[in-house]
From Swiss-Prot:
Record PANTHER family: 10 KDA HEAT SHOCK PROTEIN, 20 KDA CHAPERONIN, CHLOROPLASTIC
Keywords in alphabetical order: Chaperone, Cytoplasm
Subcellular location as annotated: Cytoplasm
Family that this chain belongs to: Belongs to the GroES chaperonin family.
Keyword Chaperone: yes
Domain of life: Bacteria
GO BP: any one term: chaperone cofactor-dependent protein refolding
The organism of origin for this protein: Opitutus terrae (strain DSM 11246 / JCM 15787 / PB90-1)
Assembly, per entry: Heptamer of 7 subunits arranged in a ring. Interacts with the chaperonin GroEL.
SMART domains: Cpn10 (SM00883)
Location (main, coarse): cytoplasm
Protein name from the UniProt record: Co-chaperonin GroES
Function: Together with the chaperonin GroEL, plays an essential role in assisting protein folding. The GroEL-GroES system forms a nano-cage that allows encapsulation of the non-native substrate proteins and provides a physical environment optimized to promote and accelerate protein folding. GroES binds to the apical surface of the GroEL ring, thereby capping the opening of the GroEL channel.
Zinc-finger is among the record's keywords: no
Amino acid sequence: MANVKIKPIGDRVLVQHIEEKEQVRGGIIIPDSAKEKPQEAKVIALGTGKKGEDGKVTPFEVKVGDRVLISKYGGTEVKLDEKKYTLVREDDILGVIE
């Protein structure tokens, strides 16, 4: 796990964006911010898990190190040491990239 100074709580997951640059014919680079698609990210840290009505904690389906897809506008963005992270609920993770 990366040495990050943010510890998620509950069912939250800390992810770090994986920046992709797409170069099209003619040498124009299209940044991710101009693309309308889910964002690829790496799971950096996990909270304690989602607590059900019965008080039991449901384990996460993702693990630290997983590459995941998150909604472009989901979660809360955080900048720490010049790196961009997002805190999302596990339910906001669209899928795991295998």
